[in-house]
């Protein structure tokens, strides 16, 4: 199976080793986000504006891309690049920005546990757009693998971790902050459906752009993150009065920004040289990293639901990428 069909590059050689390392780093950085964010809490809350962290992350990615072009880590095109090729990335930035804001607004219409479980529907929406927009076909075996990924995510979100002081398992989001009553509203379900659709569309659309344009990945990322910085700068400025850009930041917060920036760059490489489906497996496998770090850093206990989720993920990987 080829890379563009959602598979892995050819086995053997240094290229395969680099690809494997990139996937492992992507999984680690994605899974570390929630535990690192929990370590930033002061008196049970994040002491800085979320928009500040997003803006600084986008700015860090932009600077790293510019640096890679300036020092020659990636070659600049032989002729002046057609800057009109930057315009399509504005839509990618807009879709990602809309998704980030929907996540915040969804918390007003449902509890974090319900959101964590239902948000796994974005796996299905990504697969749908992958087939429709890229004209790829998934076999029954591959479709079953993606269903197992959805089940694994829902299983882990429903109770993969437990606070030692609580008799009941909790979702990763509530295990560190305390229990929240389960609730969901009709507007919340509609917003969640919109979130899942935008999530799938943004991933597949960005993959299409990255693969269609014959430009260095760093230059494509430069286009994307320029729009991302402008969009998030506007959102931050329009967010009303609040803490300053760096107010409340600590060493842990800086690590969150750096890890998220690295993750964004790695994910773009995954989608250019792999696929949106590969990205789904990276995100799902990151649950294992999330759980292990939560247990080690936050003193949370792993439950049977976590081990079931890990088993389902392993089975899904075998079904999708294993020998036919």
Swiss-Prot record:
Pfam families reported for this sequence: Nuc_sug_transp
Subcellular location: Golgi apparatus membrane
GO cellular component terms given for this protein: Golgi apparatus; Golgi membrane
Positions on the Cytoplasmic side per record topology: 1-18, 74-85, 162-177, 236-248, 301-324
UniProt keyword annotations, A-Z: Golgi apparatus, Membrane, Sugar transport, Transmembrane, Transmembrane helix, Transport
Claim: Nucleotide-binding is one of the keywords in the record: no
UniProt-listed SUPFAM superfamilies: Multidrug resistance efflux transporter EmrE
Stretches assigned to the Lumenal side: 40-52, 107-140, 199-214, 272-279
GO BP terms: transmembrane transport
Alphabetized GO MF terms: pyrimidine nucleotide-sugar transmembrane transporter activity; transmembrane transporter activity
Membrane association type: Multi-pass membrane protein
InterPro entries: Nuc_sug_transpt
Purpose: Mediates the transport of CDP-ribitol. Does not exhibit CMP-sialic acid, UDP-galactose and UDP-N-acetylglucosamine transport activity.
Self-association state and partner proteins as the record states: Found in a complex with SLC35A2 and SLC35A3.
Similarity annotation: Belongs to the nucleotide-sugar transporter family. SLC35A subfamily.
Protein name per Swiss-Prot or TrEMBL: Probable UDP-sugar transporter protein SLC35A4
Species of provenance: Sus scrofa
Gene: SLC35A4
